[in-house]
From Swiss-Prot:
The keyword Signal applies. It comes from Conus monile (Necklace cone). It is found in: Secreted. Keywords: Amidation, Disulfide bond, G-protein coupled receptor impairing toxin, Secreted, Signal, Toxin. Belongs to the vasopressin/oxytocin family. This is Conopressin/conophysin, isoform 2. GO terms for molecular function: neurohypophyseal hormone activity; toxin activity.
């Protein structure tokens, strides 16, 4: 059985086209940590390493919980403000970050990120499980004020 030049050309062309389709399929399924669909990179395996989410907000008291969402206990949640710009850098990392906070939401898939606010993969909502006791809130607020004062003193102190 002889293969003509035309048949070889068609076969090569078909192989190249198939290779190109596989390449496009592989790159189209890639996504950043924060904007993947459910079951994407956010579906973290228990054995996969994670890191703490980046600090954000005034004096770094919050944590990034989305590409332009920063939440913290004494802070609440900031969305789309200059303080949240640092959260865009979360998309650049290939290692997912773990949002700290008590579990909340349906099937405990979310985390309490601020007083009364629970965030899951793609949304935040009010949740009574995330309410902070007034005594505990006062203690956290006083501790944050003290740390802020110490930081300012250290920055303003001139060493000889």
């Amino acid at each position: 059985m002889k293969c003509s030049v035309l048949q070889m050309s068609r076969l090569s062309w078909a192989m190249c086209l198939m290779l190109l389709m596989l390449l496009l399929l592989g790159t189209a399924q890639g996504c950043f940590i924060r904007n993947c669909p459910r079951g994407g990179k956010r579906a973290v395996d228990a054995l996969q390493p994670t890191r703490q989410c980046m600090s954000c907000g005034p004096d770094g008291v919050g944590q990034c919980v989305g590409p332009s969402v920063c939440c913290g206990l004494g802070l609440g949640c900031l969305m789309g403000t200059p303080e949240t710009e640092v959260c865009q850098k979360e998309n650049e990392s290939s290692v997912p970050c773990a949002i700290s906070g008590r579990h909340c939401g349906m099937d405990n898939t979310g985390n309490c990120v601020a007083d009364g606010i629970c965030c899951v993969e793609d949304a935040c909502s009010f949740n009574s499980l995330c309410r902070v006791d007034t005594d505990q809130e006062d203690s956290v607020s006083a501790r944050q004020e003290l740390l802020t004062l110490i930081r300012r003193l250290l920055v303003n102190r001139q060493y000889d």
